[in-house]
Amino acid sequence: NYKLNLYKPMVIYLMRHTAVDVPQGVCYGQTDVPLKPTFETEATQTAANLQGLSFDKVYTSPLTRCVRLATFCGYPDAERDDRLKELNFGDWEMHRFDEIADANLERWYADYLHVKATNGESFEDQYRRVAGFLDELRQKPYEQVAIFAHGGILLNAQIYAGIIKPEEAFSALTPYGGIVKIKLS
């Protein structure tokens, strides 16, 4: 039962952006929000955790919170890719979850994997976006890659790599400034 694997093994380090300066309970997704004043302290820790690693390629979400961390960590020329943006919460962006008067929100809470935010995406939509990016990345000759992105992207990359199941996603959320390592073979 020999299975032909056309892909080279690849190690991917995914870094979540640092803490955002948004009131708790506010849905911000793809909105370009400011970072907390603790950015430099948090980013210093992330950079220290990457020390000694080298990457064949570095990518980042185009949102400022990720570009700033990539730049701080020494990668100002990281390639920006829209597929690495956070979940698009559509009409709910920048509203408190407990103040959203949309009947669709209850459906989303009951089945966030499949139900789209009003005029936005579902978690499954975001997964397809991330899987498409990773499928394309696997065809490149890289052995070690860095990606500066968002909590949802890190979760979906772990699902793609078989580390977690979609139903476990939100209990596996990486802290701000945290790093997840996945291996693809």
Residue ranges of predicted features:
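Domain-level recognition of soluble alpha/beta enzyme cores
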Residues: I164-S185
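Extreme N-terminal starter segment of soluble prokaryotic enzymes
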Residues: P9-Y13
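Phosphate-handling substructures
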Residues: C73-R129
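Histidine-centered catalytic micro-motifs
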Residues: L14-T18, F148-I153
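Short beta-strand scaffold positions
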Residues: T60-S61, R128, F148-A149
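Active-site-proximal alpha-helix that buttresses catalytic centers in soluble enzyme cores
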Residues: M15-P76, E121
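Short, active-site-adjacent cap segments at secondary-structure transitions
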Residues: D21, R65-V67, E86, I153-N156
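Glycine-rich phosphate-binding loop signature in dinucleotide/nucleotide-binding domains
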Residues: Q51-S54, L137-E143
